[in-house]
C-alpha cells in the first residue's frame, strides 16, 4: 500500500544520508567514538539544512520503526548497514555502554525533535546558535549510558545519598 511505499522511501533516503555521513567520518579519520558521533550528527544536520525538502519529507514520516529500518537497510554497495557500523564503532572504542540501542534512540529523538524548528524556522534560535547546546547535551547522554556510571550523587537537605540509575 501507499504507506508501505512511503515508509520504504523514507527509510531509503534516511539510509543514504547515514551512509554518506559514515563515509565522511571515515574520510576524516576520526577514531574516538564520541567525536565520531558528533561528526555524524553535524554532517547530517548540515545536509538537512542544505536540503530542507528532504528534512520535511523525512521528519513528517519518521517513526523509530522506519528509522530503524533505515539502519538495517543495505546501502549502495550492499555491505553497509548503519546500525552495524554504529555497533562496530562502539566495539572499537573500548567503551562499554549500557543499552546502546536506547542511547542511539535517545540521541536521534533529541536531534530530530529539537533541530527541526531551528533549521526550518530559526526558532527558538538558529541551528548555528543551537549546536553547542546540542553537542553538550549529547555528550551528557553518552556519559549517562556509560556502563561504569550507574549511580550519581543527589544532594538532599542534610545528607548526600546515592540514587541507583540501573535499569
Language-model-derived ranges and their functions:
Residues 15-19, 53, 66-94, 101-105, ...:
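Amphipathic alpha-helical packing segments from all-alpha helical-bundle domains
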Residues 39, 43, 85, 133-137:
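Alpha-helical elements of Rossmann-like donor-binding domains used by nucleotide-donor carbohydrate transfer enzymes
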Residues 164-165:
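Intrinsic-disorder-associated, low-complexity terminal segments enriched in Asp/Asn/His/Tyr and depleted
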Residues 4-16, 20, 58, 78:
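Alpha-helical DNA-contacting segments of helix-turn-helix folds
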Residues 18, 22, 45, 112-119:
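Regular secondary-structure segments
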Residues 90-138, 145-156:
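Hydrophobic/aromatic-rich alpha-helical bundle segments in the mid-to-C-terminal region
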Residues 8, 12-15, 22-51, 104-107:
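Hydrophobic alpha-helical connector segments
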Residues 47-69, 116-117:
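Amphipathic alpha-helical segments used for helix-helix packing
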Amino acid at each position: 500500500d501507499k504507506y508501505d511505499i512511503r515508509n520504504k522511501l523514507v527509510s531509503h533516503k534516511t539510509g543514504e544520508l547515514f551512509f554518506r555521513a559514515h563515509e565522511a567520518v571515515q574520510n576524516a579519520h576520526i577514531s574516538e567514538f564520541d567525536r565520531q558521533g558528533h561528526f555524524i550528527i553535524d554532517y547530517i544536520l548540515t545536509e538537512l539544512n542544505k536540503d530542507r525538502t528532504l528534512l520535511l519529507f523525512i521528519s513528517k514520516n519518521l517513526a523509530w520503526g522506519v528509522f530503524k529500518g533505515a539502519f538495517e537497510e543495505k546501502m549502495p554497495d550492499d555491505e553497509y548497514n548503519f546500525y552495524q557500523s554504529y555497533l562496530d564503532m562502539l566495539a572499537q572504542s573500548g567503551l562499554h555502554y549500557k543499552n546502546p540501542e536506547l542511547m542511539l534512540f535517545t540521541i536521534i529523538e533529541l536531534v530530530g525533535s529539537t533541530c527541526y524548528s531551528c533549521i526550518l524556522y530559526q526558532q527558538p534560535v538558529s541551528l548555528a546558535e543551537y549546536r553547542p547546546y546540542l553537542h553538550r547535551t549529547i555528550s551528557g547522554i553518552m556519559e549517562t549510558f556509560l556502563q561504569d556510571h550507574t549511580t550519581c550523587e543527589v544532594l538532599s537537605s542534610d545528607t548526600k545519598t546515592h540514587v541507583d540509575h540501573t535499569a
